[in-house]
Swiss-Prot record:
Its main location: plastid. Keywords: ATP-binding, Cyanelle, Nucleotide-binding, Plastid, Transport. The gene is ycf16. Residues 9-253 form the ABC transporter domain. It comes from Cyanophora paradoxa. GO terms for cellular component: cyanelle. This is Probable ATP-dependent transporter ycf16.
Amino acid sequence: MSTEKTKILEVKNLKAQVDGTEILKGVNLTINSGEIHAIMGPNGSGKSTFSKILAGHPAYQVTGGEILFKNKNLLELEPEERARAGVFLAFQYPIEIAGVSNIDFLRLAYNNRRKEEGLTELDPLTFYSIVKEKLNVVKMDPHFLNRNVNEGFSGGEKKRNEILQMALLNPSLAILDETDSGLDIDALRIVAEGVNQLSNKENSIILITHYQRLLDYIVPDYIHVMQNGRILKTGGAELAKELEIKGYDWLNELEMVKK
């Protein structure tokens, strides 16, 4: 039996700017199916910019390079098309949507994905039976389904709601942008357990984080350290421990060597 992995994402010399300021200065990254990659780096290094560009945020302009998602040019797709194709972004600060119940929002997103796959839409009752199972992944009470999207949710509840969306949509590529930000240890553990349950040999996950503590619960296959819009170093899980001890200052010397 072949164990060859499928290439999910290939980023080649990606350059990007926002409001005329260059942020990404040549990012290269390859991710295969079944892999978890963590991107770490100091504030302002370009980590969150990279995640938003993958999702198609209109404020960021790609000025060079290419992004291939399952061998297709991701940059040619609108944000909604990327989502339907299997790219999922969990925001650092999930937005609130007044007047839209969580279950209606989730069913719309789920049925849009089904349509993309040529499947029929699910009626509310059938969908409820599916989403009820997924609630167990993130230990959420069913009453959250009837509340407006993220409205009045705590920070931990918002992050768990994002992972619930991920569980339903089963994306090929999930990008978790500082999902650990603002979480206490119990909420972090619940979110991490949910992510670990959803990780499988068919999908890929990018964890973007500033701190090592998330990686105590979700062990990545690769860690990439970003500084000044470039990936300067790649290693295994041990690299996060090195960063915890050394901090990020040593990257300045490494960057000088690579220039």
